[in-house]
From Swiss-Prot:
SMART domains: WD40. It comes from Canis lupus familiaris. G proteins are composed of 3 units, alpha, beta and gamma. Interacts with RASD2. One of its GO terms (molecular function) is signaling receptor complex adaptor activity. Its main location: cytoplasm. This is Guanine nucleotide-binding protein G(I)/G(S)/G(T) subunit beta-3.
Length: 340
């Protein structure tokens, strides 16, 4: 028997051990657990604001921690910081590369970041002495496009890339502190845990991974999707994650039980998911789809309880405010809408 065959058998045995361990953790099912829960009822939300100003597809958005400002990135080569109360543009930042795929707001409100097919993460200071917004750093070491970025604080940012890696950067020095290797397909999205100690990534290898920021190691891997994972987010308490995929489903994975709890899908939905976000309580899951809609799911019962339909093209990004009072959707129709 060849060495390869031996290793293959060993791998299969290990897989079986993992499956058994997961079964032992599954002392109940989510459906059993929530059978006594009140039904959410129909969730109806209205468009409260429409943010007009981009001249092309919007690819990404991210709320500031004040639940008032948000940043959006568009194919028109602009990064716009909006005041969602008044719909005024606080900053319109022309980008060096218009092929932007992601943007992020720093928790402090001092910086925004973006990146895309230029393989770089550009950091912009919003609080410069001169009052104008300027590039404070360009972080380049990825060998593929930048798919997502999220600040940990004003000096640390995590990025995911088409080169299959994620990276933690020291913004001051412009250097990568840690490279997170393990995915076997383009890394499409990432999300940081509520305590900023962990982050999760979703990739075109159809897996999601949980990483330890300080140790630089992969703690857990979650499989089950049948196609690329485009979007990922943490449950508000940080103990579960949700993924959205081109296989037309979202899935909920529990970190402690190390397995999938439920999937959110419907026979009538046949298109991919671009973006996912939970309500503040975690009871509602918002998911943006290629069919121009945003579906609202009861995360516990797995039923669709509402739909946000106001866009004339793909919903490319969405986000819930830190105070839980509003959800914003961004679309290829060039508009952002704020709902509640």
């Amino acid at each position: 028997m060849g060495e390869m065959e031996q290793l293959r058998q060993e791998a299969e045995q290990l897989k079986k051990q993992i499956a058994d361990a997961r079964k032992a953790c599954a002392d109940t099912t989510l459906a059993e657990l929530v059978s006594g829960l009140e039904v959410v009822g129909r969730v109806q939300m209205r468009t409260r604001r429409t943010l007009r100003g981009h001249l092309a597809k919007i690819y990404a958005m991210h709320w500031a921690t004040d639940s008032k400002l948000l940043v959006s990135a568009s194919q028109d080569g602009k990064l716009i910081v909006w005041d969602t109360y008044t719909t005024n543009k606080v900053h319109a930042i022309p980008l060096r590369s218009s092929w932007v795929m992601t943007c992020a707001y720093a928790p402090s409100g001092n910086f925004v970041a973006c990146g895309g097919l230029d393989n770089m993460c550009s950091i912009y200071s919003l609080k410069s002495r001169e009052g104008n917004v300027k590039v404070s750093r360009e972080l380049s070491a990825h060998t593929g496009y930048l798919s997502c970025c999220r600040f940990l604080d004003d000096n640390n940012i995590v990025t995911s890339s088409g080169d299959t890696t994620c990276a933690l950067w020291d913004i001051e020095t412009g250097q990568q502190k840690t490279v997170f290797v393990g995915h076997t397909g383009d890394c499409m999205s990432l999300a940081v845990s509520p305590d900023f100690k962990l982050f999760i990534s979703g990739a075109c290898d159809a897996s999601a991974k949980l990483w330890d920021v300080r140790e630089g190691t992969c703690r857990q891997t979650f499989t089950g999707h049948e196609s690329d994972i485009n979007a990922i987010c943490f449950f508000p308490n940080g103990e579960a994650i949700c993924t959205g995929s081109d296989d037309a489903s979202c899935r909920l994975f529990d970190l402690r039980a190390d397995q999938e709890l439920t999937a959110y899908s419907d026979e009538s939905i046949i298109c991919g998911i671009t973006s996912v976000a939970f309500s503040l309580s975690g009871r509602l899951l918002f998911a943006g789809y290629d069919d121009f809609n945003c579906n609202i799911w009861d995360s516990m019962k797995g039923e669709r309880v509402g739909i946000l339909s106001g866009h004339d093209n793909r919903v490319s990004c969405l986000g819930v405010t830190a105070d839980g009072m509003a959800v914003a959707t961004g679309s290829w129709d060039s508009f952002l809408k704020v709902w509640n």
